[in-house]
Each structure stands twice: as C-alpha cells, then as structure tokens.
C-alpha cells in the first residue's frame, strides 16, 4: 500500500535551514514539505537532496507568499490561494490546505477568526467543486487546539475524539458546521516529549509555556488512513538537534519544531 508522508515546519526566516530540511526529508521519507517563513535557497536544497538521489520541485503557490511547498509527488495541482493559505490537489484525491495564520502579536482572536472563516468557507467550496471529501489541513495557526479558531464551530471545528466527528457536522443555531478530526490534542502536555511545537515564557496571567501551534487536521473520512504512530513532533535528526540545552526549540535554528504525519493511500 502506498503512503503519503507530509511535514510542516515554520523555519523562522533562517537562511541556513537547508541542512536540517534535507535531513528531515531523507530520514522521514517526506513526500510533501510545507514551509512557513522559508527564506533559504531552494536550489541549494535541491543540490543537497540530489546527493541522495532525491528530486524535489516547488509547488505553485502564487498568491500565498507565506507558504512554500516542496514536493516529490508529481501530481499536485494548485487550487485556491490567498495571503494565508495555499490549497493543493493531490492525485485528484486529496485537498491539502497549507496555512500560516498571523501571530498573536499582530492579530487578535477576532482578526484571526476573520481569516479562518474565509478559509473554512473556501475549503467547503473546493470540496464541493472538486468532489473531494479527503481534506487535510496543515497549519501554523498561532493557537492551541483548545482555542477558538481551532475548536470553534465557526473556525476549523477540530474535534479531539474521532467518534464524535463521525456524524460529520453539528447543528448550532439552525446552521450546520462540518467537523475536522484534530489528532494534535494527543500531543499536548508532558506525557511525551516534546510537549508542543512552540515555547513561550511570558508574564501573561494565562500562559501554558508550551504550545501546539503547528497542527494537522483531517476530515473524519480520512481517520482510517491516518497512521497514529507516525504523527510526530520532531526535536532532532540523526545528525542534529533542533532543541537547545533547556530542551526548548533552538531559536538559532527555528522557534518552532516541525511536525510529520502519514496517510496510507487507497
């Protein structure tokens, strides 16, 4: 059975990030890599990967400067694009929405909510237009799974328990809201390491320190193809660590840690 392996990483504008990206693509056998804040040299990365007989191409993301998508799969076509979102059609079977939403420093929950509502609307338009139900979201949402944009019915509606998503939608105030299944809830907290993808030590009254800002969400129909054990937050490669001496994301590399997941294809 074929598999689709995807990685998402906010590379924090690090111009020297390519050696880390190369390690991840090789070791994790990545088919599609979605990057936020990528400002390194793609041609340099291609040469690094060529040493392993790996050929990558850049997907078309015109209209979305915040996302760079690198692919090893040939059959990927662009769909809707805007400032915060690049949608891609994979094998005429999956709709992949790659997002980088604004930071809490520059947009409050209401502003982010406007951007999210527009994207959710467009996802449903594309699903209907293309006849695709197998939608995957990969995102640096700058919110945790339990916050409004992720969990709210008018947001991504990312539910932590698959059984509750089997009915596909909820009716609230006489309006139907489709659901996503969000497996990232399982990676919150210190039962496993790392406890999140982003660390922030501030003096706000409410501060969880570790955050899961980088997430994957899937439509419930994909649950059977989602490989639980392959959902990972990476904190190292075989050659290099991505965390510092305090076990926090090494900001000299990136202030975010990458996530990896796998879909078993039909």
Label for each model-derived stretch:
Residues 1-3:
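Acidic, histidine-bearing metal-coordination/catalytic regions of metal-dependent phosphoesterases
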Residues 5-11, 21-43, 96, 119-151, ...:
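Active-site beta-strand/loop signature of hydrolases that rely on acidic residues for catalysis
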Residues 9-14, 113-114:
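Short, flexible loop segments at the rims of nucleotide/cofactor-binding pockets, characterized by
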Residues 24-25, 49-52, 113-115, 153-157:
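Glycine-rich, phosphate-binding/catalytic loops in enzymes
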Residues 32-104:
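Structured beta-strand-rich core segments of catalytic domains in phosphoester-bond hydrolases
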Residues 101-116:
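Surface-exposed cleft-lining segments at the edges of enzyme active sites
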Residues 128-131, 145-266:
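Metal-dependent phosphoester-hydrolase catalytic domains
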């Amino acid at each position: 059975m074929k598999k689709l392996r995807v990685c998402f990483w906010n590379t924090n504008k690090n111009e020297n990030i390519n050696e880390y990206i190369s390690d991840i693509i090789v070791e994790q056998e990545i088919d599609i890599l979605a990057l936020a804040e990528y400002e390194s040299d793609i041609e340099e990365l291609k040469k690094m990967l060529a040493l392993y007989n790996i050929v990558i191409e850049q997907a078309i993301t015109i209209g979305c400067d915040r996302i760079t998508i690198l692919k090893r799969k040939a059959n990927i076509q662009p769909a809707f694009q805007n400032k915060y979102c690049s949608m891609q059609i994979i094998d005429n079977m999956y709709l992949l929405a790659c997002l980088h939403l604004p930071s809490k420093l520059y947009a409050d929950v209401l502003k982010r909510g406007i951007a999210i509502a527009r994207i959710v609307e467009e996802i449903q338009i594309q699903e209907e237009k293309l006849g695709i139900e197998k939608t995957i979201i990969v995102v640096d949402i700058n919110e945790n799974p339990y916050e409004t944009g992720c969990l709210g019915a008018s947001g991504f509606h990312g539910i932590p328990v698959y059984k509750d998503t089997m009915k596909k939608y909820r009716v609230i105030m006489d309006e139907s809201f489709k659901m996503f299944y969000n497996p990232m809830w399982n990676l919150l907290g210190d039962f496993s390491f790392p406890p999140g993808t982003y660390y922030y030590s501030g003096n706000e009254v409410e501060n969880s320190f570790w955050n899961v800002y980088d997430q994957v969400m899937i439509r419930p129909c994909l649950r059977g193809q989602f490989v639980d054990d392959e959902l990972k937050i990476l904190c190292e490669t075989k050659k290099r660590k991505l965390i510092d001496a305090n076990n926090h994301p090494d900001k000299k590399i990136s202030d975010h840690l990458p996530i990896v997941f796998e879909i078993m294809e039909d």
